[in-house]
C-alpha cells in the first residue's frame, strides 16, 4: 500500500513538474510582436523573440503534439514565415501533397538536445513524405516509442517498414517552394542535410533535377543518419 501511494505521489509530482516546464516554455514563447534576433551560429548560438510554427494548416502539420506543446517548434521569424509561405504556395502547385515539419528550436534558442545544432533559430527539420505500397500518402509514424518519428528507418533506396517508401518528388517540390519563399523574405537556404545515399533519388525526381542549381546539399554523412527527415539551415544575418 505504501509503495502504491509513493508511486502515485511521484506520478503526480512528475506531471506537475512537466506542466510547469511546459508553462515556462510557453511563457517565453509568447509572441510580443518584436522581430527575432539570432546570435552566433547553429551550434552555440541563441535566439531572441523566437516565433512558433503553426500546429497545422491545410496541407501540413507538426510531427507530434508533444513536441509542439513542449516548445520545440520555434524559429527566427523570417525563417518561420518562409516555411509557412512555402506551404501556402504548395497548396496551389501541389494541392494533393501533405507535409510534416519536425523540430526547430526553443523560443530562446540555445542547446537543443539531442540535436547538435538548432541553437540560433535558423534550423528546422522536415519529416520525409511517404507513399504506401498502394500509392497513398502517409506520414512518418510518430510516437513516444520511436522518438516522435526520429527513430524510423529507411534504406538507401528509400524503403521503410510495412511497404512504405519515400516520396522524393514531394520532397523536391517542397524544397523548391521553400527556396523561393525564403528568397521572397530576403533570406535564403544555406544548406540542406539529407542522407547522401538518398540524394541521387531526390535529384532523379522530376522536380529534383533543378535542386542542385538552387540549393546546397551537404555531401557527406552527418553524425546521425538523415533518412526519415531532412534538415534545413537558413542563411540569416546574426549578431
Segment roles from a protein language model:
Residues 1-17:
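N-terminal Sec-pathway targeting helices
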Amino acid at each position: 500500500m505504501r509503495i502504491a501511494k509513493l508511486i502515485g505521489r511521484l506520478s503526480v509530482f512528475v506531471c506537475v513538474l512537466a506542466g510547469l516546464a511546459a508553462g515556462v516554455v510557453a511563457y517565453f514563447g509568447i509572441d510580443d510582436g518584436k522581430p527575432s534576433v539570432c546570435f552566433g551560429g547553429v551550434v552555440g548560438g541563441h535566439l531572441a523573440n523566437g516565433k512558433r510554427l503553426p500546429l497545422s494548416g491545410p496541407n501540413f502539420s507538426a510531427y507530434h503534439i508533444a513536441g509542439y506543446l513542449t516548445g520545440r517548434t520555434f524559429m527566427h521569424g523570417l525563417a518561420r514565415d518562409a516555411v509557412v509561405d512555402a506551404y501556402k504556395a504548395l497548396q496551389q502547385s501541389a494541392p494533393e501533397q501533405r507535409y510534416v515539419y519536425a523540430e526547430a528550436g526553443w523560443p530562446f534558442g540555445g542547446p537543443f538536445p539531442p540535436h547538435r545544432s538548432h541553437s540560433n533559430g535558423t534550423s528546422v527539420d522536415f519529416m520525409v513524405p511517404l507513399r504506401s505500397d498502394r500509392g497513398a500518402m502517409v506520414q512518418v509514424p510518430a510516437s513516444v516509442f520511436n522518438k516522435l518519428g526520429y527513430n524510423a528507418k529507411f534504406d538507401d533506396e528509400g524503403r521503410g517498414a510495412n511497404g512504405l517508401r519515400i516520396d522524393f518528388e514531394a520532397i523536391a517540390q517542397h524544397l523548391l517552394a521553400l527556396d523561393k519563399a525564403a528568397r521572397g523574405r530576403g533570406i535564403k537556404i544555406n544548406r540542406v542535410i539529407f542522407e547522401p545515399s538518398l540524394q541521387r533519388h531526390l535529384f532523379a525526381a522530376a522536380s529534383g533535377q533543378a535542386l542542385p542549381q538552387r540549393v546546397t546539399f551537404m555531401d557527406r554523412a552527418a553524425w546521425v543518419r538523415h533518412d526519415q527527415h531532412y534538415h534545413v539551415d537558413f542563411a540569416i544575418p546574426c549578431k
